[in-house]
Amino acid sequence: MFVLPGYDAFLGFLLIAAAVPVLALITNAVLAPRSRQGERRLTYESGMEPVGGAWIQFNIRYYMFALVFVIFDVETVFLYPWAVAFHRLGLLAFIEALVFIAILVVALAYAWRKGALEWS
């Protein structure tokens, strides 16, 4: 008997959420073909023979653009539900959203000032 009534569905969800990745890893370990050591590190190029090496260094600029993109992409994910339920939430939710946007504007100004948005 479960101690917290009403949480059976949540416990079931947690068990399934923990079991799916474990089962995926076990299935991969059992069913994946074993490759020889030399071919294991080769780049896959759609069944063609690899041309050149794939181990190159990327410029740090790509990392900075990706980081800024992820930050503002997450902002969009957080603001969309707020915009959908704007009429029902009231003044406090509006003020909270303004504070959230202000923090992101400060972060954007900081990134701009540090040169994270410049390509040259």
Curated annotation (Swiss-Prot):
GO cellular component, one term: NADH dehydrogenase complex
Localization of this protein: Cellular thylakoid membrane
Entry-linked Gene3D superfamilies: NADH:ubiquinone/plastoquinone oxidoreductase, chain 3
Membrane topology annotation: Multi-pass membrane protein
Substrates-to-products reaction catalysed: a plastoquinone + NADH + (n+1) H(+)(in) = a plastoquinol + NAD(+) + n H(+)(out); a plastoquinone + NADPH + (n+1) H(+)(in) = a plastoquinol + NADP(+) + n H(+)(out)
Keyword Thylakoid (UniProt): yes
A single GO molecular function term of this UniProt record: quinone binding
Transmembrane segment boundaries: 10-30, 64-84, 89-109
Alphabetical list of InterPro entries matching this protein: NAD(P)H_OxRDtase_bac/plastid (IPR023043), NADH_UbQ/plastoQ_OxRdtase_su3 (IPR000440), NDAH_ubi_oxred_su3_sf (IPR038430)
Superkingdom per UniProt: Bacteria
Any one GO biological process: photosynthesis, light reaction
UniProt KW keywords: Membrane, NAD, NADP, Plastoquinone, Quinone, Thylakoid, Translocase, Transmembrane, Transmembrane helix, Transport
Primary localization: membrane
UniProt xrefs under Pfam families: Oxidored_q4
Documented EC number(s): 7.1.1.-
Quaternary structure and interacting proteins, as annotated: NDH-1 can be composed of about 15 different subunits; different subcomplexes with different compositions have been identified which probably have different functions.
UniProt xrefs under HAMAP family: NDH1_NuoA
Similarity annotation: Belongs to the complex I subunit 3 family.
Biological role stated in the UniProt entry: NDH-1 shuttles electrons from an unknown electron donor, via FMN and iron-sulfur (Fe-S) centers, to quinones in the respiratory and/or the photosynthetic chain. The immediate electron acceptor for the enzyme in this species is believed to be plastoquinone. Couples the redox reaction to proton translocation, and thus conserves the redox energy in a proton gradient. Cyanobacterial NDH-1 also plays a role in inorganic carbon-concentration.
Protein name in UniProt: NAD(P)H-quinone oxidoreductase subunit 3
Organism listed in the record: Synechococcus sp. (strain RCC307)
